[in-house]
Amino acid sequence: MTTRQPLYKSLYVQVLVAITIGILLGHYYPETGVALKPLGDGFVKLIKMVIAPIIFCTVVSGIAGMQSMKSVGKTGGYALLYFEIVSTIALIIGLVVVNVVKPGAGMHIDVSTLNASSVAAYAAAGAQQTTVGFLLNVIPNTVVGAFANGDILQVLMFSVLFGFALHRLGSYGKPVLDMIDRFAHVMFNIINMIMKLAPIGAFGAMAFTIGQYGVGSLVQLGYLMACFYITCLLFVLVVLGGICRAHGFSVIKLIRYIREELLIVLGTSSSESALPRMLAKMERLGAKKSVVGLVIPTGYSFNLDGTSIYLTMAAVFIAQATDTTMDITHQITLLLVLLVASKGAAGVTGSGFIVLAATLSAVGHLPVAGLALILGIDRFMSEARALTNLVGNAVATVVVAKWVKEMDNDKLASELASGGAPLVDTRPTDDLGVAEGPAR
């Protein structure tokens, strides 16, 4: 009989308490809350420090260990098909909701009175985003540069090529694969150590958010925020829930399974902060390493459902608030632009805002200065974006794994039924051979 872990030792409880304390401190002592920003920034930087090597190890081990290269192409093809379908649904849902509810109607904002300088940096970054530029950026100038900059797509591309090359070498490349597998164990143990600081990071990030923007900013544009949060919730429960039911599992149980990762994301507003743990969690759920290694990292740029909902809602909200006419032609154009632009977002705080700036610049019909309207609440909306993105990528991993028959359904059922035990830090045995994330 196993002894139940005390509540105070649960990462879930620790992060939840830290977020609560951070909110209270930021509200009652805003200056102190703002000063705690480095705690949140430091934690996110620690996570980002190991994301590139973990993706490399996971993808290379998964691809090099596969029996056939055809299965890699099949997995990638199914993943991109799923991403495109579901993210398009998310864009359309956001567009429909904002047109029905009209959260910006009646504000009658004069664009000339807006402080365009406050969003100049975002607008400049957005103007540089082009489809060709995005595609070329997937190819790193140097391998070292890809890892040094922590660019997920660049690291992923090199990892796929490295995995293919290692697979072609057969037994000759086995020593290299073994070394990479053992290196993966080291990296996952580093993650386990870093995650002990998650409550401190979540506390600092939340205290800063409330201290900097205040609870008042939540009320100021609360209608838009409420619409967005409710839309994200309905998307998760109805759309993703329907996809889950169609594939024989429950989205509620899946959310319960990744509850610790969701709380980390809630505290940091960045789905990227949970990426290393998601790789381990989804593999433990029963998905093959090759599927997890391709779907999760790729999903962080191509399957951002929460960001997709946000982009259409925010763009039309700005049009409504500034009395800018948006007929059906303009809205279809907006949707088509976002089908491409939304794939350039990444799972980091602020990327959605930059893509929104790029979209407004590309459409031309919408005032870029209107970004100033939602700048103050964007930080609060990023929580819902990041949470929806994380759940969306978890669902995508299970669904794609089922499509390509690389899912252990018995393991999936048992893990979801148990709620998932916390990831523990144990040392692998010398004869383990292949890394499988943190030891079970």
Swiss-Prot record:
Sorted alphabetically, the keyword list is: Cell inner membrane, Cell membrane, Membrane, Symport, Transmembrane, Transmembrane helix, Transport
Q: Where is region (Disordered) located?
A: 420-440
The topology of this chain with respect to the membrane is:
Multi-pass membrane protein
Q: Which GO terms describe its cellular component?
A: plasma membrane
Which InterPro entries does the record associate with it?
C4_dicarb_transport (IPR023954), Na-dicarboxylate_symporter (IPR001991), Na-dicarboxylate_symporter_CS (IPR018107), Na:dicarbo_symporter_sf (IPR036458)
Recorded GO MF terms: fumarate transmembrane transporter activity; malate:proton symporter activity; succinate transmembrane transporter activity
Which Gene Ontology BP annotations are present?
A: L-aspartate transmembrane transport
- Name its cellular compartments: Cell inner membrane
The superkingdom of the source organism is Bacteria
Q: Does the keyword Membrane apply?
A: yes
Claim: Cell division is one of the keywords in the record: no
Q: Which Pfam families does the record associate with it?
A: SDF
Main subcellular localisation:
membrane
Bilayer-crossing residues are: 15-35, 46-66, 78-98, 146-166, 190-210, 224-244, 291-311, 332-352, 354-374
| NCBIfam families, A to Z | PRK01663.1, PRK13027.1
| Family, similarity comment | Belongs to the dicarboxylate/amino acid:cation symporter (DAACS) (TC 2.A.23) family.
This chain's function reads: Responsible for the transport of dicarboxylates such as succinate, fumarate, and malate from the periplasm across the membrane.
Full protein name = C4-dicarboxylate transport protein
Whose protein is this, by species? Pseudomonas putida (strain ATCC 700007 / DSM 6899 / JCM 31910 / BCRC 17059 / LMG 24140 / F1)
- Tell me the lineage of the source organism: Bacteria, Pseudomonadati, Pseudomonadota, Gammaproteobacteria, Pseudomonadales
